[in-house]
C-alpha cells in the first residue's frame, strides 16, 4: 500500500481511530482530526465528496455497524423520570459513565450554564456511538447559540443532518433512525427552519423513542403545528401527551407546558396560559431549568412577564440576559436561512409587546395582560415602531417570530 499524502480534492480524515482511507486500491495515511476541503463528515471520520462513490458502500457499512452497536438512548436526562429538584440524583443513578456525562451536560444546558455544557460534551462530538454523538451535537449547537458562536453551532447542526441522511440511506435499526430524526427536528423546529422536502415526518418515528424522549418529541410536533398557526390542534396534541405519561418527566413536561401556553395565548385564553406557565415554572424552579423559558420567551408573548417579572425580579433579570444572548445567536443561524430576518433591535419586554401588537391586540388588552397602564403600552408601541422604522403596527410581523 502506498503512503503517499492525499491531495485536498481526494480525501480527508477520520478521528484518531480512523487513520487510513482506501481509494482505488491504494491506502493513504491520514492526519488525525484534520479536515480537508471538498469533504463530508460522518460518525468517526471524514470522506472526500469527489471520490465518494468509489468507497460509499464500504464506508456506510462501517458507519452503520457502529450505529448498530449502540444500546444507549439519546438525551438521557430528558428521558429520565424524577421529581422536581432531584435532577442531580437522577444523573447519579445512571451507571454508564459516558451517558452520565451527557446527562450532566444536559443539566448544565437546561439550567442555562452554556459554557459548562460545551466543556462537558465537546469530547463526544466525534464519538463512534451515535446516541452520544447526537446528544452532544444538539447540546453543543444550542449552547453555542447562547455563547455567540454560530459557526460552531452550524457545524454540529450539519453533523446531525449527515447522520440522519446516512441512517436513512442504509436503513439503520429503527431506534437509530428515530434518534437521528429526533435530533434533526429538535434543531430544525427550534430554529424555525423547515426540513428539506423528503425528510420523514417526525410523528412516524415518535413511537420508537423511549417515553421521556417521546414526550419531548411530542412537544416538537405541537410546536411544528403551532408554526402553521393551527393553535387549537397544537394545544390538543400537548394535552394528549400529558394524558399518556406514566411518571414525571420534568424537562419534557416543561417544554410541553410552554408550547401549550403559546397556543393558549394565541387563542386569547390568557388565564389558562398564565396557569400553564406558572405550573411549568414551579416544575422547573427547584432544578433551575431556565432554558426552556429562555428559548420560548418571545412566543409566550408576555406570559413570562406576567408570571415572573414583578414577583421574582432577580430571576426575571437572569431570564432577560439569557434571552438576549440566545436570541442573538439564534438569529445568526435562522436569518441567513430564511427570507424574513427576525429583529435584534428590541428588548425582551418590547418584543413581547410587539408580538401582541401585530396580532391585533388593542393597547387596552395588552395593558391588562401585562399589568401595565395604557399610556405605558402606547409609549412602548411607539418606540417599537420607531426602532423598526415602520409606520403601522401590522408591519411588525415582518420583524418577529410568528
Each PLM stretch: what is its role?
Residues 62-80, 99-113, 134-150, 176-192, ...:
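Tandem amphipathic alpha-helical repeat scaffolds
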Residues 89-97, 122-133, 160-174, 200-213, ...:
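Solenoid-like repeat scaffolds
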Residues 1-2, 16-22, 26-37, 41-134, ...:
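Flexible inter-repeat linkers and adjacent short helices
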Residues 333-382, 386-391, 397-402:
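Helix-turn-helix DNA-binding segment
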Residues 2-13:
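Extreme N-terminal basic, low-complexity initiation segments
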Residues 186, 210-348, 364:
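Linker/hinge segments immediately adjacent to helix-turn-helix/homeobox DNA-binding domains
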Residues 73-89, 106-122, 148-163, 188-201, ...:
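Helix-turn-helix repeat elements of alpha-solenoid scaffolds
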Amino acid at each position: 500500500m502506498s503512503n503517499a499524502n492525499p491531495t485536498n480534492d481526494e480525501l480527508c480524515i477520520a478521528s484518531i481511530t480512523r487513520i487510513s482511507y482506501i481509494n482505488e486500491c491504494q491506502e493513504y495515511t491520514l492526519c488525525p482530526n484534520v479536515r480537508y476541503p471538498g469533504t463530508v463528515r460522518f460518525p468517526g471520520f471524514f470522506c472526500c465528496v469527489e471520490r465518494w462513490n468509489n468507497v460509499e458502500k464500504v464506508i456506510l457499512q462501517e458507519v452503520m455497524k457502529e450505529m448498530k452497536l449502540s444500546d444507549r438512548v439519546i438525551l438521557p436526562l430528558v428521558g429520565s423520570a424524577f421529581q422536581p429538584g432531584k435532577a442531580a440524583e437522577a444523573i447519579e443513578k445512571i451507571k454508564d459513565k459516558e451517558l452520565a456525562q451527557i446527562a450532566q451536560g444536559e443539566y448544565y444546558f437546561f439550567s442555562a450554564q452554556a459554557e459548562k455544557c460545551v466543556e462537558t460534551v465537546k469530547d463526544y462530538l466525534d464519538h463512534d456511538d451515535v446516541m452520544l454523538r447526537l446528544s452532544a451535537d444538539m447540546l453543543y449547537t444550542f449552547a453555542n447559540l447562547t455563547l455567540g458562536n454560530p459557526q460552531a453551532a452550524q457545524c454540529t447542526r450539519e453533523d446531525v443532518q449527515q447522520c440522519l441522511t446516512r441512517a436513512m440511506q442504509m436503513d439503520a435499526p429503527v431506534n437509530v433512525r428515530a434518534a437521528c430524526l429526533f435530533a434533526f427536528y429538535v434543531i430544525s423546529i427550534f430554529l424555525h427552519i423547515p426540513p428539506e422536502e423528503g425528510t420523514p415526518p417526525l410523528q412516524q418515528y415518535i413511537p420508537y423513542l423511549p417515553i421521556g424522549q417521546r414526550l419531548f418529541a411530542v412537544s416538537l410536533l405541537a410546536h411544528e403545528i403551532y408554526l402553521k398557526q393551527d393553535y387549537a390542534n397544537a394545544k390538543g396534541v400537548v394535552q394528549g401527551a400529558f394524558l399518556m405519561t406514566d411518571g414525571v418527566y420534568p424537562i419534557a413536561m416543561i417544554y410541553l407546558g410552554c408550547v401549550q401556553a403559546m397556543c393558549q395565548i394565541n387563542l386569547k385564553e390568557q388565564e389558562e396560559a398564565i396557569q400553564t406557565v406558572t405550573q411549568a415554572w414551579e416544575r422547573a424552579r427547584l432544578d433551575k431549568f431556565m432554558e426552556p423559558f429562555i428559548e420560548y420567551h418571545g412566543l409566550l408573548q408576555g406570559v413570562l412577564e406576567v408570571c415572573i417579572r414583578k414577583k421574582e425580579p432577580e430571576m426575571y433579570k437572569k431570564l432577560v440576559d439569557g434571552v438576549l444572548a440566545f436570541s442573538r445567536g439564534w438569529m445568526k443561524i435562522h436569518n441567513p436561512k430564511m427570507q424574513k430576518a427576525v429583529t435584534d433591535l428590541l428588548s425582551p419586554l418590547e418584543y413581547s409587546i410587539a408580538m401582541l401588537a401585530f396580532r391585533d391586540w388593542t393597547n387596552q388588552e395588552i395593558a391588562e395582560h401585562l399589568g401595565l397602564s395604557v399610556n405605558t403600552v402606547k409609549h412602548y408601541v411607539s418606540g417599537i415602531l420607531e426602532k423598526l422604522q415602520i409606520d403601522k403596527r401590522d408591519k411588525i410581523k415582518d420583524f418577529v417570530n410568528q
